[in-house]
Amino acid sequence: MTRLVNNPDNFPSQAVAGLVSAFPNHLRPVFGGVVRAARTDRKVALVVGGGSGRYPAFAGWVGPGFADGAVCGNIFSSPSASQAYAVCKAADRGAGLLIGFGNYAGDVLHFGQAAERLRSEGINARCLLVTDDIASAPDHLKRRGIAGDLPVFKVTAAACEEGRDIDEVVAIFE
């Protein structure tokens, strides 16, 4: 497989910069990822994220009718808690914040830390864990999130766009 990479150490930031330069009216770069360029206040915000390397996930999912922000870690590695916090803070619209990710140890830890910090600041932040990979474990709470991320986040985002409150959106997700 041929790869076009300037420097593997800078891959996520360069990929985000390229995406933002291609869609400057739709995306805005922030530390750790991207958020929508246009803000819709007083709606539940959805931030998605995880390791980079499987594009268009996750930055390519940001836009109207989908996510409000995306946290982009290194290639196949979880983003840091500070990256998750920064993207979530920038994506917050004042009606609660949902953070969606697959069931990977680093993501659970780092997105969970970001949510705790946001809650300590008075933001109603909740984590949405996708556990669709039936091949990875028999117990659904131990399954990873793989292909199911896309449809699960899309349905969740549609509920956010409709203006539903955070409890309704979480119920739809579950």
Sequence positions of predicted segments:
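Glycine-rich oxoanion-binding loops at beta->alpha junctions
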Residues: 54, 58-94
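Short, acidic/small-residue loops that bind anionic groups at enzyme active sites
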Residues: 70-75, 119-142
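Internal, active-site/partner-interface "lid" segment
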Residues: 136-146, 151-174
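Glycine-rich, flexible N-terminal cofactor/catalytic loop recognition
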Residues: 32-64, 71
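N-terminal amphipathic/basic leader segments beginning at the initiator methionine
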Residues: 1-46
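Short glycine-rich or small-residue beta-strand-to-loop segments that form or flank ligand, phosphate
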Residues: 2, 44-51, 67-70, 96-105, ...
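Short glycine/serine/threonine-rich phosphate/pyrophosphate-binding segments
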Residues: 55-58, 82-85, 106-112, 135-138
